[in-house]
Amino acid sequence: MKDQFASYFEKPEFKRTLAHYEEMLSSGDTRYFEATELTEIAEYYAMNGDSQRAEAALDYALRLHPDNLDALIFKARARLINGHLNEAFNIAETITDQHDREVLFLKAELALANRQHSIADNILRAMIEGEGHEAETYADIIDLLVDNKQTDMANDWLEEALARHPRKQILMESAAYSYAQQERFDEAIEQYNQLLDMDAYSALYWEELGKIHFLREEYDKAIDAFEFAIAINGDSSYYSIYAAANSYFNIGNYERALEYYQRLHKVYPETVDPLFHMGMCCVNSGDDDQAMEYFTQALATVADGSEEQAQIYSQLSLIFSRKTQHEKAISYVDEALKIFPDNTELIIMKGHEMLCQGRYDESTEIFLDALTMNSQHVERSLFLIGVSMLENNYYEMSYHILRLLKENPAIEDELLYPYLCLCEWVLRESSFKSTLATSLSISPRKTYEIFNLPATQGESVDAMIERLNTINQSQSAV
């Protein structure tokens, strides 16, 4: 069964190989890698949209292993993906064994890309007949068609396969994969549940089921599935441990999420992701000092100039901002900007720190630069600037900016309305009650957080306003 979410690339052993390869590129040296290692690296780059690096890895593989079948097939597919169909055909023709099973699959794939569906079907028909209509062959064909987004053909082959081999486990796996890829999640879940009836101790089935629930944001169900996989495979269940941690994180159970991230870090101490997320759990739990320790440890594990390094610098900047150490915050955001100098969110962060210091003119200049740089997607920048103005008590300016974004699809109402509420409350706008009602209905947790109030389940708008008035009167009396 195919892993539709490419969890292999999250595993530390792959990350180590990738790091060794990238170190080789940086140093200009040459090192020996197995052809399989290089094709996996190429697949990783391709999955992340970096076709140039993918092909470079394949070229290096063919330099070391010029007749390697897997590398040649992958190279042909890479050319195909990049729109060079003729080159892909030419590479396929150079392969010595034209009757190799994987070469036939490649030829079918090339025919599909050339919209020669009947030729592709003939190749696949000859294969299924030559292999005696075996269930395993059907499964491979269905997976190929699904991967090439030939939904109708895949469904026809699946129907035929299940008619010949009803309740054959490998075909049920292909069916589940196909349904998941087509986002027919209810049917995919049903298939995985049937597979689990056959093999309740399959960590793979539990993991795949968890992934679907995670995609549907059904985090409680995802956690149940991932924890079954973990119970079966223990610490070797890297993906399931990571996904369970992420699921707990997404429902705000940072204590439980932290336990899973710590478990990952203990087993895979050289991997940065658990350390970074351990820091984020502490940030969200209000423990900035512990978060700083984790982020500092994480810095020691990342490559200079990497995206991960920039993310850590930005989090450290935010921590020092909350500690009102704004010069220190600026120093860390400057480090992040060395890596991504055109990142408008980082630029706005720097402007925010200057505004916190009362450097209004300088911050305004930086904000305007950010808006100019991000003119095609200005709404997100405006929102961040509006929030910065609000947090620095420039309520009228903040309200003017945020009000421009009402009913703008680029900014989700769940993000916008709590901040609008606070502006309207401070400015005593007549629309406050209506805005508060909307905010409580779509983003209750953030609304209470913005007003620094403990959440009260089922509280009416009038009751919350009464609480706010009581607090306001108490503060005025003091």
Per-segment meaning from a language model:
Residues 36, 70, 102, 136, ...:
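Start-of-helix register in tetratricopeptide repeats
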Residues 74, 106, 140, 174, ...:
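Canonical tetratricopeptide repeat
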Residues 97-99, 298-300, 403-410, 421-447:
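TPR/TPR-like (Sel1-like) alpha-helical repeat modules
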